[in-house]
Amino acid sequence: MALSTVLALVSALVPFLHLPMGGNFTLASMLPVVVISYMFGVGWGLFAAFTYSVIQIVMDLCMGLSGSVLLPLFLPQSDDYMGAFAAVSILVLDYFVAYSALGLGGVLRDRVKSKTAALVGGALIAVGVRYLVHVLSGYIFYGAWAEWFFSQEGWFQGFGAWLLARLDGGALALVYSFFYNGLYMIPEVVVTALVAVPISRIARIRREEPLKKGN
């Protein structure tokens, strides 16, 4: 179980896309935690996922303080930082809650006959819930960035102008959060599900009964 958590952390250190306001796309870095939940049960999965979230936040904070990555805790067009409550709430939602959701990966093991479908479906649920938590956090705390984001030049400039002409306020903030977080989470969901297919065929993972700690 510890090895799977380490594998997840190592995979997360090699992002293929790192967005400026947080979030990155990796090659199925969350799958080892999902597999823990599938093999040992949701209880141990949630424990491993929470441990993963704690280590992840420490690593990101260290990189942020060293200047390696941007800590997106400031307000648009301003040098002012968010208040302490907002900053702590972001850490709780985007790390503790979002990453802990990966522990739901084993929720379908005893409900779906096909082992492959159970693992793939569990991965989709776990990573999908993480995506929705990030969307909620983005909507609440980063909605102020929506207008700035969609007004930037780039490949989606036309789409951004179209949105800005039709939406504002909370609706624009919600679309922004779905869009921004979807840039890295949707590919992550797809890749995780695809990699889960061959992983589900490994004999030790396909065991009829969940493994007990120490097996």
Regions found by a protein language model. Name each.
Residues 1-215:
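Loop-helix junctions at membrane interfaces
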